């Protein structure tokens, strides 16, 4: 449902940045108010990311007002905060389709708009990409500006600091904006600091600063004294010493919700040479009181009525796999004081809130630091503790070298609880958990499990926790099947699957939660169905038995076919000279766009009807 733009008269005049830049500066506060209201009313009707965007309204308006986008390059880190950017760059009327199949992408996306410089979704990439653009712009020599906007969470990642370290070395013209949306505005924010920002970013201060450096360049001790004096003077009122040490000129912190002050400061900083760093303080959820009070709860929202001042309560029902994991942690930690649970900033999403409160000394949130999370577990395992790394499939990609080098080579007992494995739905290409089986299966010493339901998940988590080497349990986003969960823990025999339906001619080897789809498809085909349970080691005896008793084998998984579980089945059969036709069903060799999980399963032929159809067509060849 498209919103009535006549209710937003100033916003109606700014459908593109070109139109925005024609508006009188005095109208910008009104524009921000209308943009914030429009965003709230739009996202509440479509669902999506809300609190982050509410906090970046003034910054977005100021950036597009001051800079000549898309000629000047604007990069948003992660992209949760970029909804106002989408609204102001010609996509306002499409906002009701965001995160939906064939609709607007949930994050900035190059194919969608010339204003989206970088396709994003994972954090902490903006400064590296911005630096590359800035170096190229400097060589181009046409005065093109580059701005990277990064949040206080994303900037904690090592990649961001690596980029800043390099930027200070090569010294190109670029601006990094730190959007610091902690819960309260810093005491440094206010008239004095806004005035200081204008002074420090102004041409007079810069001329004196640079001129003094040139005059004193031949006298190193005096030059160092001047540098330290300037640093200490600024340090009295600004917390930017760290960024200055990286070679950036630091300005701030300033109020990120004062659009006119932002415009003044950005205009000054636009003319400065070398790496610049602007620190702004914002409030996540700004302008909508429930989101201000609960920015985590309103980070991503379902459809809701803003006038109710609350989100709709979930209907309960079947537990999510994340909850199954969280309950396992609590139950297991009650028995095992050496259990240590690690998450890279995914406490809520991974189902670890209860555990973090009940076992705070065994809970470690390392922030957005996947590489560190994995090697932290290494140290704990060497010390004799029992670490579990809770991580999304898509983010485990960021700790791949550590998985190999720091865990698998030493055969350490670290378990990975891999959430969001398979298709996650609305977050699109950057978040689909399509590759974990492929990139883990080739690692020696790994044990990889794929549960078919909630109880299998619980018992596999126990199995992995008790295993004496590296292991992984991968499970999907969302609710389970309603299977009864056994409270007692039972370790599964490593590398053993089970036949759950006897048929003839065709055997479906199911890996993971597609098992109900396989069973439904098997009815009309009268096919055998096996729940393989283990991707590594494979149940080779069961594969051999199924190949002996059937004409065709079909593998089924929610992972890329390339290098996945099905590929492992074929590798074993070829090694053993078991010559039988094998049909691999799974995710195709392409990045999967957004849509609901059900829509994507149907589109890719991985629902029951699609599986049955694919097998029937294969048999007919």
Swiss-Prot record:
Keyword Membrane: no
InterPro entries in the record: Dxylulose-5-P_synthase, THDP-binding, Transketo_C/PFOR_II, Transketolase-like_Pyr-bd, Transketolase_BS, Transketolase_C, Transketolase_CS
Binding site for thiamine diphosphate: 80, 121-123, 153-154, 181, 288, 370
A Gene Ontology molecular function term of the record: thiamine pyrophosphate binding
EC number: 2.2.1.7
Cofactor requirement: Mg(2+); thiamine diphosphate
GO biological processes: 1-deoxy-D-xylulose 5-phosphate biosynthetic process; isopentenyl diphosphate biosynthetic process, methylerythritol 4-phosphate pathway; terpenoid biosynthetic process; thiamine biosynthetic process
EC class name: transferase
UniProt keyword Magnesium, yes or no: yes
GO cellular component terms, A-Z: cytosol
Record field: catalytic activity: D-glyceraldehyde 3-phosphate + pyruvate + H(+) = 1-deoxy-D-xylulose 5-phosphate + CO2
Pathway the protein contributes to: Metabolic intermediate biosynthesis; 1-deoxy-D-xylulose 5-phosphate biosynthesis; 1-deoxy-D-xylulose 5-phosphate from D-glyceraldehyde 3-phosphate and pyruvate: step 1/1
UniProt function note: Catalyzes the acyloin condensation reaction between C atoms 2 and 3 of pyruvate and glyceraldehyde 3-phosphate to yield 1-deoxy-D-xylulose-5-phosphate (DXP).
Subunit structure: Homodimer.
Protein name (database record): 1-deoxy-D-xylulose-5-phosphate synthase
Organism, as annotated: Vibrio parahaemolyticus serotype O3:K6 (strain RIMD 2210633)
Gene from which the chain derives: dxs
């Amino acid at each position: 449902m498209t919103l009535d733009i006549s209710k937003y008269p100033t916003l109606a005049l700014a459908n593109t940045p070109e139109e925005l830049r024609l508006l009188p500066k005095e109208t910008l506060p009104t524009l921000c108010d209308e943009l914030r209201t429009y965003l709230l009313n739009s996202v509440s009707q479509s669902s999506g990311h809300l609190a982050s965007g509410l906090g970046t309204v003034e910054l977005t308006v100021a950036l597009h007002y001051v800079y000549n986008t898309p000629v000047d390059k604007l990069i948003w880190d992660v992209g949760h905060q970029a909804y106002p950017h989408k609204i102001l760059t010609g996509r306002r009327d499409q906002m009701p389709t965001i995160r939906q199949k064939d609709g607007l992408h949930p994050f900035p996306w190059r194919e969608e708009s010339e204003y989206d410089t970088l396709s994003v979704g994972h954090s902490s990439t903006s400064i590296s990409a911005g630096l590359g653009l800035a170096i190229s712009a400097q060589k181009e020599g046409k005065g093109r500006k580059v701005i990277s906007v990064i949040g206080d969470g994303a900037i904690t990642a090592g990649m961001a600091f690596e980029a800043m370290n390099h930027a200070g070395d090569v010294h190109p013209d670029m601006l990094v904006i730190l959007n610091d949306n902690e819960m309260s505005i810093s005491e440094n924010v206010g008239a004095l600091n806004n005035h200081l920002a204008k002074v420090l970013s102004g041409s007079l201060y810069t001329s004196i600063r640079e001129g003094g450096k040139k005059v004193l360049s031949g006298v190193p001790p005096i030059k160092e004294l001047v540098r330290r004096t300037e640093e200490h003077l600024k340090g009295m009122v600004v917390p930017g010493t760290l960024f200055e040490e990286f070679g950036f000129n630091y300005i701030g912190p300033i109020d990120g919700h004062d659009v006119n002050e932002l415009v003044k400061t950005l205009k000054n900083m636009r003319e400065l040479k070398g790496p610049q760093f602007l620190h702004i303080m914002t409030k996540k959820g700004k302008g909508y009181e429930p989101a201000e009070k609960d920015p985590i709860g309103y980070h991503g929202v379902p459809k809701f009525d803003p006038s109710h001042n609350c989100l709709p309560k979930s209907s309960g029902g079947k537990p999510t796999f994340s909850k199954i994991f969280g309950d396992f942690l609590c139950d297991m930690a009650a028995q095992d004081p050496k259990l240590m649970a690690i998450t890279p900033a995914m406490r809520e999403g991974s189902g670890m809130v209860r555990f973090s409160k009940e076992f705070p000394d065994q809970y470690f949130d390392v922030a957005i630091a996947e590489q560190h999370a994995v090697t932290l577990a290494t140290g704990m395992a060497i010390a004799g503790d029992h670490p579990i790394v809770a991580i999304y499939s898509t983010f485990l990609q960021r700790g791949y070298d550590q998985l190999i080098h720091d865990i698998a080579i030493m055969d350490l007992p670290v378990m990975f609880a891999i959430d969001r494995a398979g298709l996650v739905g609305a977050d699109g290409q950057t978040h689909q958990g399509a590759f974990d089986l492929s990139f883990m299966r080739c690692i020696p010493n790994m044990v990889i499990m794929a549960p078919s339901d909630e109880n299998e998940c619980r018992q596999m988590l126990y199995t992995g926790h008790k295993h004496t080497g590296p292991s992984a349990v991968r499970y999907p986003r969302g609710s389970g099947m309603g299977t009864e969960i056994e409270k007692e823990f039972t370790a599964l025999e490593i590398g053993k699957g089970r036949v759950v339906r006897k048929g003839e001619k065709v055997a479906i080897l199911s890996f993971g939660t597609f098992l109900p789809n396989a069973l439904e498809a098997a009815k009309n085909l009268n096919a055998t169905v096996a729940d393989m349970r283990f991707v590594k080691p494979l149940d080779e005896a069961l594969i051999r038995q199924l190949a002996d008793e059937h004409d065709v084998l079909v593998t089924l998984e929610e992972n890329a076919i390339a290098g996945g579980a099905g590929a492992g089945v074929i590798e074993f059969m070829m090694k053993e000279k078991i010559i039988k036709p094998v049909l691999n069903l799974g995710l195709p060799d392409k990045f999967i766009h957004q849509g609901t999980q059900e829509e994507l399963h149907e589109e890719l032929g991985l629902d029951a009807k699609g599986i049955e159809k694919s097998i029937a067509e294969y048999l007919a060849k």
